[in-house]
């Protein structure tokens, strides 16, 4: 997992809608305009979706909404992008269903995860289901939790003066990572309450405000190429 996970915060920072369902790579010489144009979000078939690309990213990351909760993204780039589809608000008791038809990642780093934020206190969370060559396992190891037929290691880290959904803030990251990648082409569940309860038992309960969006995220960084096709429900 990328050391500065909170760069994914930009995905959930804005909620501007976009009529296009396929979002091509964005190029602009003006840094401010590039920052704005490289973020798109909206709703599709009742699901919230978003894609964000870092300033200076070269190459491409092409996101497309499919039917229902489906989306796909293909990329060949050097930089960082995040995208996904899910809900306009989080929930500590949501059970996420998904089927990842394909996930390939060559070079760089990245993961596919259930992702979101809470407030009061401000916290960033991930449940990592799949990844590239490097398993997300940075930060302090806290405990192990069993859920949905798998075993997850729980990690936490403190971020000081880092990007967040509320601007530059200090906040805690908390995340669960499966001990092995989940399989593709099959239906899976993420019983989020199991993770939220395990984090709370370790002393790092999520905030009381779960209103920020929560998505099934695809993220990649560095020099990488790949493809993900996933349906969430």
Regions flagged by a language model, labelled:
Residues 84-147:
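Extracellular-facing segments of soluble proteins and assemblies that are Gly/Ser/Thr-biased and enriched
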Residues 31-39, 58-106:
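Short N-terminal edge-element motif at the start of the domain
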Residues 186-233:
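Long, compositionally biased interface segments
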Residues 2-8:
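Sec-dependent signal peptide recognition
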Residues 5, 16-38:
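Bacterial Sec-dependent N-terminal signal peptides
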Residues 121-184:
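An exposed acidic His-Trp-rich patch
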